[in-house]
Swiss-Prot record:
This is Polymerase basic protein 2. The lineage of its organism: Viruses, Riboviria, Orthornavirae, Negarnaviricota, Polyploviricotina. InterPro entries: Flu_PB2_2nd (IPR049110), Flu_PB2_6th (IPR049114), Flu_PB2_C (IPR049115), Flu_PB2_CAP-bd (IPR048298), Flu_PB2_middle (IPR049111), Flu_PB2_N (IPR049106), INV_PB2 (IPR001591), PB2_helical (IPR049113). It comes from Influenza A virus (strain A/Turkey/Ontario/6118/1968 H8N4). A motif (Nuclear localization signal) lies at residues 736-739. Keywords: Cap snatching, Eukaryotic host gene expression shutoff by virus, Eukaryotic host transcription shutoff by virus, Host gene expression shutoff by virus, Host nucleus, Host-virus interaction, Inhibition of host RNA polymerase II by virus, mRNA capping, mRNA processing, Viral transcription, Virion. GO terms for biological process: 7-methylguanosine mRNA capping; cap snatching; DNA-templated transcription; symbiont-mediated suppression of host gene expression; symbiont-mediated suppression of host mRNA transcription via inhibition of RNA polymerase II activity; viral RNA genome replication.
C-alpha cells in the first residue's frame, strides 16, 4: 500500500509525468533487449501502441488508386507521407473497414469446398445438442484419438502425392498415384477446384485436413470418436462433464465402426470353417464396406481392435505389440518372464496344462470400461490397482487379472468341470477355460482369495469380496483408484505371424491374439457391409441363405450345367452349398442327398428327361454326404421362418416358385433371377447316332469357323474342333475324339450334351 501511495504522489507532479512521457530511453541494456533480433519481444504492447497511432498500417502505393483519400464521414484513410525507410504508404485502420465494405468482391463458390471441414464442423455444432452440466470426479485416461473429423484414410505420403497433383500439377517430381482412393479423390478435387483463386498453400493445408487422419494422445472420459473429440474442451473438465449429442456423423467414424463389425463377423465365421485362415482371407478380400474394399481399409486404418488386428495379421500387416486377454489390452511395462508348461489340479481335481510365466512383470491393462496396473511374480499377484466406471466393470478387470496371475487359489476355486468350447466346438485352451468359468460366477474366487487390512493412501480404497468399497480391508493385493491408467501411447507396430487357427504370435512366439478374444457384442453397422463370400450368407438368417444359394446357381448356370453332366462330384463339393446344409433337418440330410443324386443320375442316363428347373431346385440337397436308401420323396423340408417349409420335387411351392411366363424364379417371395433358357424341353430326337465319335463341348464358338453339316464332319482329324449344325438349325461346338474306345457312350451323352449346349 505504501508503495502505491508513493507512486500516486509522484504521478501528481507534472515533472514526473513529463519525464515519463517525453524523455528518451537511453539505457543501452534496455535498448538492446527490445531491438535485437527480428522477434517482437512484447507483441501485445506493440499492437496496442501501434493501433493508437493514426496510420499504423503500411500498404503498397497502388492502394492510393484503389481507395479514396477520405471515407463518407470525411475521415482520412491514408496519409500522403511516405513510410520512413520504404516505398510504401501509411494507412489508417479505417481503410480496412472501407475495403471490407466497398472493396472488390470475388467469387465465394470455392470457399465451402476448400474449407469443407470447417463448414461441416459448424453444421455439426449447429445441430448438436448440449445437455446439462454434471459435477463429478472424471476418470480420464489418455487414449490415442482421432482429432480430425471427416477425413479420408490416406497415409501422409499418399496424401502428399494427391495434394501435389491437385494444387501444383505442373511442379516437377515423380508422383505415382496407385490406390483407387487416391485416383478418385484427385479427380474429384480437380473438378471442384477449377478456377479457384484461394492461395494454393491454403488449399494444400485444407486438403491435408481432409485426407489424413491426425491422432493425439489425449485424456478422455467418454466417447472417443472424432465428433466427440472435436468438442472435448466443451464436454469434460477436471470435475465436470457436459452431455453432448453430435449434430451429424462423419464417414471416418462410420468406417471405423463398420470395420470392427465386419471384422468380428468374419473372424467368428472363419473360426467354424475347415480352414479358418484361408476362409478369413477369402472373406476379407471379397467384402466391401461403404463401397470400398475391406482390404484397402485395413491397410490404411489404424483402428486397434482384436478382430481387426487378426484380419491385419492374416494380410501380413504389422500390428501393435500389446496382447489381448479377457477383452483387456495388456502391455508389459517392465520385467520379463520365461514360459514353462506346468500341470495343475483344479478344485474339481481336473488336470490342466498351463503355460506358466516365470518371473516378475508389470502390465497396464486397458479395457473399454475399466483400466488397471498389475504387478505379478511367478503364479502370484503382487498388486492390482484398478479403476473403472462402475462395480461391474471393476469386477471384470479383477477377474481377468486374477486368472492371468495363474495363482493356485484361483485354480483351486474352480467348482465343477471345465469344458467350454468355441464356435467350432473345439475345447478352449486352459487359460480361457478358467476365464470363462469365473466370468460366469466369481463368487468362490473372490471368497477364497483372501483379504488384508489396508493403509490409508490418498485416492485409493479397498474392495471387498462382494465388490463393495471399504477403507479398512481389501481383497489381497487389490486396490481401487480414482485415477485411470493411460492407454499405451506408442504407435509402434511389429511383424507378427498367424497360424491356420488364427492365433497371432509375435516373433518371440508369445500369443498376442486369438479368436477367443474377439468380442461377441453385436452392433449395427453405419455403412453398408457387402459380404460377397458365400460363407457370410447366413449372417442375415436362413432366408438369406436360401435366396443366395439359388441366386448363385442361376448366376453361374453356364458352368454349373456343364459340371452337372460331366463332373457332378466336384459340383456337389462346392463351398457355396455349405451354408444351405444348416437348413436341412439333420436326420434327413443323407437320405435327401442319396435320393437327389440317384434322380440326377437317371436324368443323365435317360434321354430327354433333363429338367433345368428341377436340377436347380434340388441341387443344393445333393451336397450332403449321401446315404444309400430306396426312399422316394415327393417333397423336401427346409427349416426357415422358424418352421419346416416344403420344396416340392415336382411343382411349385411358396419356397421355390418358377413362373413359366416370365421365366423368373422367386424364392420365399423374393426374386432370385431369370433363367435365360427355355426349361421346358420335353423329348427331342437328336441325331445322337450320327454324333458318335465326337465330344460335344458346348455352344457355338465363332473362332472355329462356319457351321458344318453333319455329313461334312467325317473329314475332321482326331482332336480337331468344329461347329456343327444339328436338328432344328441349332449350332454346337464339337471335337473329334482322340480314342475310339469311348465312342459307345457318345450316343447316350450326345442327347443331353446337345440339349445343354443349345440352352
Amino acid at each position: 500500500m505504501e508503495r502505491i501511495k508513493e507512486l500516486r504522489d509522484l504521478m501528481s507532479q507534472s515533472r514526473t509525468r513529463e519525464i515519463l512521457t517525453k524523455t528518451t530511453v537511453d539505457h543501452m541494456a534496455i535498448i538492446k533487449k527490445y531491438t535485437s533480433g527480428r522477434q517482437e519481444k512484447n507483441p501485445a504492447l506493440r499492437m496496442k501502441w501501434m493501433m493508437a497511432m493514426k496510420y499504423p498500417i503500411t500498404a503498397d502505393k497502388r492502394i492510393m488508386e484503389m481507395i479514396p483519400e477520405r471515407n463518407e464521414q470525411g475521415q482520412t484513410l491514408w496519409s500522403k507521407t511516405n513510410d520512413a525507410g520504404s516505398d510504401r504508404v501509411m494507412v489508417s485502420p479505417l481503410a480496412v473497414t472501407w475495403w471490407n465494405r466497398n472493396g472488390p468482391t470475388t467469387s465465394t463458390v470455392h470457399y465451402p469446398k476448400v474449407y469443407k471441414t470447417y463448414f461441416e464442423k459448424v453444421e455439426r455444432l449447429k445441430h448438436g445438442t448440449f445437455g446439462p452440466v454434471h459435477f463429478r470426479n472424471q476418470v480420464k485416461i489418455r487414449r490415442r484419438v482421432d482429432i480430425n473429423p471427416g477425413h479420408a484414410d490416406l497415409s501422409a505420403k499418399x496424401a502428399q502425392d494427391v495434394i501435389m497433383e491437385v494444387v501444383f500439377p505442373n511442379e516437377v517430381g515423380a508422383r505415382i498415384l496407385t490406390s483407387e482412393s487416391q485416383l478418385t479423390i484427385t479427380k474429384e478435387k480437380r473438378e471442384e477446384l477449377q478456377d479457384c483463386k484461394i492461395a494454393p498453400l491454403m488449399v494444400a493445408y485444407m486438403l491435408e485436413r481432409e485426407l489424413v487422419r491426425k491422432t493425439r494422445f489425449l485424456p478422455v472420459a467418454g466417447g472417443t470418436s472424432s465428433v466427440y473429440i472435436e468438442v472435448l474442451h466443451l464436454t469434460q473438465g477436471t470435475c465436470w462433464e457436459q452431455m453432448y449429442t453430435p449434430g451429424g456423423e462423419v464417414r471416418n467414424d462410420d468406417v471405423d465402426q463398420s470395420l470392427i463389425i465386419a471384422a468380428r463377423n468374419i473372424v467368428r465365421r472363419a473360426t467354424v470353417s475347415a480352414d479358418p485362415l484361408a476362409s478369413l482371407l477369402e472373406m476379407c478380400h471379397s467384402t466391401q464396406i461403404g463401397g470400398v474394399r475391406m482390404v484397402d481399409i485395413l491397410r490404411q486404418n489404424p483402428t486397434e481392435e482384436q478382430a481387426v488386428d487378426i484380419c491385419k495379421a492374416a494380410m501380413g500387416l504389422r500390428i501393435s505389440s500389446s496382447f489381448s486377454f479377457g477383452g483387456f489390452t495388456f502391455k508389459r511395462t517392465s520385467g520379463s518372464s520365461v514360459k514353462r508348461e506346468e500341470e495343475v489340479l483344479t478344485g474339481n481335481l481336473q488336470t490342466l496344462k498351463i503355460r506358466v510365466h516365470e518371473g516378475y512383470e508389470e502390465f497396464t491393462m486397458v479395457g473399454r470400461r475399466a483400466t488397471a496396473i498389475l504387478r505379478k511374480a511367478t503364479r502370484r499377484l503382487i498388486q492390482l490397482i484398478v479403476s473403472g466406471k462402475d462395480e461391474q466393470s471393476i469386477a471384470e478387470a479383477i477377474i481377468v487379472a486374477m486368472v492371468f496371475s495363474q495363482e493356485d487359489c484361483m485354480i483351486k476355486a474352480v467348482r465343477g468341470d471345465l469344458n467350454f468350447v468355441n464356435r467350432a466346438n473345439q475345447r478352449l485352451n486352459p487359460m480361457h477355460q478358467l476365464l470363462r468359468h469365473f466370468q460366469k460366477d466369481a463368487k468362490v474366487l473372490f471368497q477364497n482369495w483372501g483379504i488384508e487390512p489396508i493403509d490409508n493412501v490418498m485416492g485409493m480404497i479397498g474392495i471387498l469380496p462382494d465388490m463393495t468399497p471399504s477403507t479398512e480391508v481389501s481383497l489381497r493385493g487389490v486396490r481401487v483408484s480414482k485415477m485411470g491408467v493411460d492407454e499405451y501411447s506408442s504407435t509402434e507396430r511389429v511383424v507378427v505371424s498367424i497360424d491356420r487357427f488364427l492365433r497371432v504370435r509375435d516373433q518371440q512366439g508369445n500369443v498376442l491374439l486369438s479368436p477367443e478374444e474377439v468380442s461377441e457384442t453385436q452392433g449395427t453397422e453405419k455403412l453398408t457391409i457387402t459380404y460377397s463370400s458365400s460363407m457370410m450368407w447366413e449372417i442375415n438368417g436362413p432366408e438369406s441363405v436360401l435366396v443366395n444359394t439359388y441366386q448363385w446357381i442361376i448366376r453361374n448356370w453356364e458352368t454349373v450345367k456343364i459340371q452337372w453332366s460331366q463332373d457332378p462330384t466336384m459340383l456337389y463339393n462346392k463351398m457355396e452349398f455349405e451354408p444351405f446344409q444348416s437348413l436341412v433337418p439333420k436326420a434327413a440330410r443323407g437320405q435327401y442327398s442319396g435320393f437327389v443324386r440317384t434322380l440326377f443320375q437317371q436324368m443323365r442316363d435317360v434321354l430327354g428327361t433333363f429338367d433345368t428347373v428341377q436340377i436347380i431346385k434340388l441341387l443344393p440337397f445333393a451336397a450332403a454326404p449321401p446315404e444309400q436308401s430306396r426312399m422316394q420323396f415327393s417333397s423336401l423340408t427346409v427349416n426357415v421362418r422358424g418352421s419346416g417349409m416344403r420344396i416340392l420335387v415336382r411343382g411349385n411351392s411358396p419356397v421355390f416358385n418358377y413362373n413359366k411366363a416370365t421365366k423368373r424364379l422367386t424364392v420365399l417371395g423374393k426374386d432370385a433371377g431369370a433363367l435365360t433358357e427355355d426349361p421346358d424341353e420335353g423329348t427331342a430326337g437328336v441325331e445322337s447316332a450320327v454324333l458318335r465319335g465326337f465330344l460335344i463341348l458346348g455352344k457355338e464358338d465363332k473362332r472355329y469357323g462356319p457351321a458344318l453339316s453333319i455329313n461334312e464332319l467325317s473329314n475332321l482329324a482326331k482332336g480337331e474342333k468344329a461347329n456343327v449344325l444339328i436338328g432344328q438349325g441349332d449350332v454346337v461346338l464339337v471335337m473329334k475324339r482322340k480314342r475310339d474306345s469311348s465312342i459307345l457312350t457318345d450316343s447316350q451323352t450326345a442327347t443331353k450334351r446337345i440339349r445343354m449346349a443349345i440352352n
